[in-house]
């Protein structure tokens, strides 16, 4: 008979200890250790066969046959883009996001799309009743006879339904509400989340079922529960977007079967999440040519995306001055301000600086450095920028402008939307001299920040 012992497990990182501690040694959080009863099993293998290998004997990697993995399209081009072309049968996808951001709406819409293609779909809800799911399905126009719904939180009962129905797609909403009866801890605890996820993954891989699992987030936007959950699943998708914005970004932070650089853009409407295939045109539809506003072509994976960077620089009598941005990392913003003051001799250190990206988009790539600097300098000098111009490039600490990747794709996207000129790194300019006829744009190659500002802000 298995012995029982008491352990204190951190609900944030999964660290366990036989005695209670106020501060978790693993993650440094306070009051996160919760008492859990753990069974000790003897002479039992704790390994998990995920069903990925056909043989347990070692073989040369050159003899391993590689075949194209079949994919199920989800009916959403944006979601398929993030997944790498669709979801693979036998894989497990974790979707994480703030409450009300659209996780359940997206998964229910995917279920309806698969059911319409003749696939058998099982939607397991642990947070709502089947009536509530039906009401949302009516609003999303996602009612189909092959879409089966059950309200269940007991993992053993869920496994029974899966074995009986043999669905092609399984959705569990959410993993924090599911529990195993043989584990004596509350649903959502580290032990429950870990063991339930492992069991769902085993069922999915054994039966070749594509599985979507919805997860909650903490107040700082990270996955609620143990980080080991992200290691168990095949793909982790994070929903981004404020409650005051109708646009949602779906970003892959882990993907065993595709790129982690792709993003999907959706618009939240009354009928659910709608794909936004031409996001650049949408984000620039309300732009005005004012000082401090510049267009920056960013790249997410293979997708060029034009965004409007806005900067406001104002004198302030208060010390220290404020630096505020929800769209750009603050440390990066402070670095660019220091470069402007040291290398371009702008007396910007005593000013309040506010930077944002229209549409609630967050930009992290270095190629946006030059655009941010130009926008701040334009606002500081109160001078308009060259009309119909895009700006991109990485800025070094010495004030030099460095080359970035996929410059041609950025220019082609800008030319498609009617932009006529671009300020870009000199090295990219030299590489693209012969491409001018292809883009139809006038290119300005800048070697340093001062030269870029001279091109972007011509004297009136």
Give the location of each predicted region.
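Peripheral, non-AAA+ core regions of ATP-driven protein-machinery
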Residues: 2-12, 16-83, 88-96, 101-108, ...
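Conserved Walker A/P-loop ATP-binding site and its immediately adjacent core
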Residues: 126-132
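Conserved RecA-like ASCE P-loop NTPase motor core of nucleic-acid helicases/translocases
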Residues: 121-125
């Amino acid at each position: 008979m298995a012995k029982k012992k008491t352990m204190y497990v951190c609900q944030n990182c999964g660290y366990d200890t036989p005695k209670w501690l106020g501060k978790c040694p693993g993650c440094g959080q306070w009051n996160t250790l919760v008492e859990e009863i753990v069974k000790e099993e003897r002479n039992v293998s704790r390994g998990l066969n995920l069903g990925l290998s056909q043989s347990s004997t070692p073989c040369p990697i050159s003899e391993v046959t590689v075949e194209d993995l079949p994919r199920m399209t989800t009916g959403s081009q944006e979601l398929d883009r993030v997944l790498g072309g669709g979801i693979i049968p036998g894989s497990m996808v974790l979707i994480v996001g703030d409450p009300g951001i659209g996780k359940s709406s997206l998964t229910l819409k995917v279920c309806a799309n698969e059911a319409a293609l003749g696939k058998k779909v099982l939607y397991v809800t642990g947070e709502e009743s089947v009536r509530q799911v039906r009401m949302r399905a009516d609003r999303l126009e996602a009612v189909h006879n092959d879409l089966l719904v059950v309200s269940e939180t007991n993992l053993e009962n869920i496994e029974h339904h899966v074995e009986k129905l043999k669905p092609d797609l399984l959705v569990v909403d959410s993993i924090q509400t599911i529990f195993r009866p043989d584990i004596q801890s509350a649903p959502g605890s580290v032990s429950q989340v870990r063991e339930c996820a492992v069991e769902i993954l085993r069922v999915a891989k054994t039966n070749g079922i594509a599985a979507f699992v919805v997860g909650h987030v903490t107040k700082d936007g990270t996955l609620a529960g143990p980080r080991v959950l992200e290691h168990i699943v095949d793909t982790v998708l994070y929903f981004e977007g404020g409650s005051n914005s109708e646009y949602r970004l779906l970003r892959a932070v882990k993907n065993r079967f595709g790129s982690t650089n792709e993003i999907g853009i959706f618009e939240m409407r009354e009928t659910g999440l709608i794909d936004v295939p031409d996001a650049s045109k949408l984000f620039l539809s309300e732009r005005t040519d004012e000082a401090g506003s510049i267009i920056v072509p960013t790249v997410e994976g293979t997708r060029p995306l034009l965004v409007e960077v806005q900067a406001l620089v104002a004198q302030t009598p208060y010390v220290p001055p404020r630096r505020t941005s929800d769209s750009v990392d603050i440390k990066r913003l402070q670095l660019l301000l220091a470069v402007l003051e040291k290398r371009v001799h702008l007396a910007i250190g005593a000013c309040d600086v506010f930077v944002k990206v229209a549409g609630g988009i967050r930009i992290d790539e270095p190629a946006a450095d030059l655009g941010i600097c130009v926008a701040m300098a334009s606002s500081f000098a109160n001078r308009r920028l060259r009309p119909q111009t895009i700006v991109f490039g990485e800025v070094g600490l010495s004030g030099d402008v460095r080359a970035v990747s996929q410059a041609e794709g950025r220019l082609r996207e800008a030319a498609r939307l009617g932009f006529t000129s671009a300020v870009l790194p000199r090295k990219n300019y030299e590489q693209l001299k012969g491409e001018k006829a292809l883009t139809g744009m006038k290119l300005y190659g800048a070697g340093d920040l001062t030269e870029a500002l001279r091109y972007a802000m011509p004297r009136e």
